[in-house]
Each structure stands twice: as structure tokens, then as C-alpha cells.
Amino acid sequence: DVYKRQDGIAEERRFYYGAQVSRGNIFKYPANVFVEGEETSLFYGLETDGIYQTGDVLPDVFGSTAVPGDVKIVDQNGDGIIDLNDRTFIGNPNPDFIYGFNFNINYKRFNASILFNGVFGNDIANGNLLQLNNAEGLTYLNISPDAYYNAWRPGNAGEIIYNEYPRIGYTTNGQPAMTDRIIEDGSY
């Protein structure tokens, strides 16, 4: 497979695909990859850049033309078509630091122990956001209020609208790869 580095240079490297992330339906391609010379299990999917607005140029996205209110996926290779060739690294589940602290105290027949541990600098893929942040319609009623009330809606002519959430009815069902919209900081 071809791997595109951060500086934009494409290299031929061995890819090994990892595990799936889903909400009952499974993406056609795994969420993480193992790339020779890189850290293990990097999240591999589609980078997004907001929501398509009325008046935007709408590309083909996996064989269908995007509509206003859809999630805007970055065309990584610049060919004007959104497909699997536009996947890139979208997160790193490997922590920069792992830390811990253990404290024990004993006095006669009383003892107490406190343990703190955590990680810093890693990403997680929060599969709950696949449903909670998309108002897909009547079949998916368990969405966040923010995703519903701040979903994309058409504006008046000339009105500039910035929406964090896609239109009501936008679906991630059948999407072949996950997007960076479900990647979060996993530090604790």
C-alpha cells in the first residue's frame, strides 16, 4: 500500500490492518493500521473539515454526490473524488507517558492504600459518537440534544452559518471508513 507522510511525500510501505470500530454495523475497513516504521495501531480513516454549506462545491463521496449539511471530508489526494484513497492517519492510541503513584499506610490493625494511574498523550476512538452526534432520523432516537438542536439547517440567502453537527438525516451507516469526528483525547 502507499503511505502518505505528513510532509506530503508518498512512500511504498507494508500495511497491516487491525480491529473494527462500529455501532452494530461494521466499517468495511479496519479503524487502525500497522505501518512499517511507524508506531503501532495508528487510527486510519478520513479527515474532516466541517460541514458542507449551501453554495459549496459538492464532490462525489463514495459514489454519491454530497449535499449541504453532510460532513465535509478532506480530499487528501486532490482528485476531486472522496474515496478510500483519501484515508490518512487521524489519531494515535499510543500514550506519550504512562504514570502511576501508590501510597500505603499501616498502623496497628488499620491500613489504607491509594493508587493513582493514568496515561497522557493518546487518542481514543469513541464509537458512541457515531450515533450520539448524528441525528439520523426516526430510527435513531438516542442522540445528544446538542447534535439535534445545533444540526445543520439551511440558512437565508447570504447568511453564513457554522455548524458543528451534520444535517438531520445524515447517516454514517455504510460509510466504508471512520472519520476523525470520533477521535478524542484519551488522557486521564
Predicted regions and their residues:
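Outer/extracellular conduits and scaffolds centered on Gram-negative outer-membrane beta-barrels
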Residues: 1-188
